[in-house]
Swiss-Prot record:
Disulfide-bond pairs as recorded: none
Biological source species: Xenopus tropicalis (Western clawed frog)
Transmembrane segments: 234-251, 289-308, 332-345, 382-401, 425-442, 482-501
Keyword line: Calcium, Membrane, Metal-binding, Mitochondrion, Mitochondrion inner membrane, Repeat, Transmembrane, Transmembrane helix, Transport
Protein name: Calcium-binding mitochondrial carrier protein SCaMC-2
Topological domains, Mitochondrial intermembrane: 1-233, 309-331, 402-424, 502-513
PROSITE patterns given in the database record: EF_HAND_1, EF_HAND_2, SOLCAR
GO biological process, one term: transmembrane transport
SMART domains: EFh
Domain of life, per lineage: Eukaryota
GO molecular function: calcium ion binding
Length: 513
């Protein structure tokens, strides 16, 4: 059988030191390196990448000159794209931007020689940590079983055949195992730190904000927690959610109006609903309730994250990440805790969305009037159906997403586990839609209970009585009032969230994808 051809040219693999950096001590050299290289390697004389000897510095300089296409003493994104292509290495524009951004210390848009060496050294250290985490047997080699086990720990199930396909893409000598040099050579000048990051390609709860923050939280590795990347992910996700919710707020308010006011006798259409809102309060009225909807993102995300981590400890898992069923249990309990903590804000959001012009001066005035007129209990109306809706929403969303993810990995992932933006958005959209469809009747009952006191002549009912009343007077279809605008906002919400999330990650220095 023909041996797989290396994806790295001899020039690229030749810049590396062949020291046993995983298990042994690095070489030392009598000949000192130049000042620029010495500065780059001061913290780690060998670094596993360059020993500091003249032959290695020469190879680095040759590689740098090869990538410096326009010969201006710096490697920009265009230089990197053209130079790597000449060497037989293909990277996406996003990957190239991340490489330059990660190494560009003076932020001039390009890498000089010292920055180039710094980037390679730092990246090599990350690759070494990942290699060690994958090498379960601690024998200096990675086999298919170790790949499968590592991904299983991260919630990604692949077959042995699939693991072997991934293995073959990196195995240069046909042994069906990967040693340190093969692993490092394959990932040279690639911004990801790689196979365990398959799970990062598939993280979606912080990316896809469709306005219903009931998703199971993402898993963060020990390294992400230690380096502070976890809070950067949360901030990026919160910012993405704020922009996404603001852009789709008119559809969200229309959904609330249709849930509360639409009936057989008042068959409100989408066009009629928008016309009614604009006629009553002008264009700005389309965004009523959006302020509180955005504000509640921060406390809810923070509480959910802390509660999720605590639930993991209570469950007692000794794994760094949980299995699917454990994630569902821990995520659902964390969702209950977070929703219980911020539920009064949910009631305020509904009341603000339903308010008439001049009814309230703002969120605080709304809260004050509800408290004086209806008492504290008003802030927890609809609490029970809201809590009951968490499990079907989160469970179905997670199950559908995991099913689609693993189906894609089994069928299409060969040398790369990166699904691409389209697959990510499609999986997130489909899973979120299924979750909402299952929990929508509970969401509608919750909204009507929250709005009862603000609707003239509306009866005060318990959850079960309201269910029976809706089915009796409107039929089963009545439990799905407002579903059309709710589904219409999913695709734009997911798309906007993803774009903003990716840009905020780069701004915050998150280089995990």
């Amino acid at each position: 059988m023909a041996r797989p051809r290396s994806l790295v040219s001899p020039l690229l693999s030749g810049v590396f030191c062949q020291c046993d950096t995983v298990g042994g001590a690095p070489h030392t050299h009598d000949t000192p390196a130049s000042p620029s290289l010495a500065a780059a390697l001061a913290a780690d004389p060998c670094g596993g990448l360059v020993c500091g000897g003249p032959e290695h510095e020469t190879r680095l300089q040759i590689l740098f000159q090869e990538l410096d296409v326009n010969k201006d003493g710096g490697i920009c994104i265009n230089d990197l794209a053209v130079g790597l292509k000449r060497l037989g290495v293909h990277r996406t524009e996003l990957e190239l931007r991340k490489i330059v951004k990660a190494g560009d210390k003076d932020q001039d848009g390009q890498l000089d020689f010292e920055e180039f060496v710094h980037y390679l050294r730092d990246h090599e250290k990350k690759l070494r940590l990942v290699f060690k985490s994958l090498d379960k047997k601690n024998d200096g080699r990675i086999d298919a079983q170790e790949i499968m086990q590592s991904l299983r720990d991260l919630g990604v199930n692949i077959s042995e055949q699939q693991a072997e396909k991934i293995l073959k893409s990196m195995d240069k000598n046909g042994t069906m195992t990967i040693d340190w040099n093969e692993w490092r050579d394959y990932h040279l000048l690639h911004p990801a730190e790689n196979i365990p990051e398959i799970i990062l390609y598939w993280k979606h709860s912080t990316i896809f904000d469709v306005g219903e923050n009931l998703l199971v939280p993402d898993e963060f590795t020990v390294e992400e927690k230690q380096t502070g990347m976890w809070w950067r992910h949360l901030v990026a996700g919160g910012g993405a959610g704020a922009v996404s919710r603001t852009c789709t707020a008119p559809l969200d308010r229309l959904k609330v109006l249709m849930q509360v006011h639409a009936s057989r006798s008042n068959n409100m259409s989408m066009l009629g609903g928008f016309t009614q809102m604009i006629r009553e309060g002008g264009i700005r009225s389309l965004w009523r309730g959006n302020g509180i909807n955005v504000i509640k993102i921060a406390p809810e995300s923070a509480i959910k994250f802390m509660a999720y981590e605590q639930m993991k400890r209570i469950i007692g898992s000794d794994q760094e990440t949980l299995g699917i069923h454990e994630r569902l249990v821990a995520g659902s309990l964390a969702g209950v805790i977070a929703q219980s903590s911020i539920y009064p804000m949910e009631v305020l959001k509904t009341r603000m969305a339903l308010r008439k012009t001049g009814q309230y001066q703002g969120m605080l005035d709304c809260g004050k009037k509800i408290l004086l007129k209806e008492g504290v209990s008003a802030f927890y109306k609809g609490y029970v159906p809201n809590m009951l809706g968490i499990i079907p929403y989160a469970g179905i969303d997670l199950a559908v997403y995991e099913t689609l993810k693993n189906a894609w990995l089994q069928r299409y992932a060969t040398s790369s586990a990166d699904p691409g933006v389209f697959v990510l958005l499609a999986c997130g959209t489909i899973s979120s839609t299924c979750g909402q469809l299952a929990s929508y009747p509970l969401a509608l009952v919750r909204t009507r209970m929250q709005a009862e006191a603000s609707v003239e002549g509306a009866p005060q009912m318990t959850m079960s009585k309201l269910f029976k009343h809706i089915v009796k007077t409107e039929g089963a279809f009545g439990l799905y009032r407002g579903l059309a605008p709710n589904f219409m906002k999913v695709i734009p919400a997911v798309s906007i969230s993803y774009v903003v999330y990716e840009n905020l990650k780069l701004t915050l220095g998150v280089q995990s994808r």
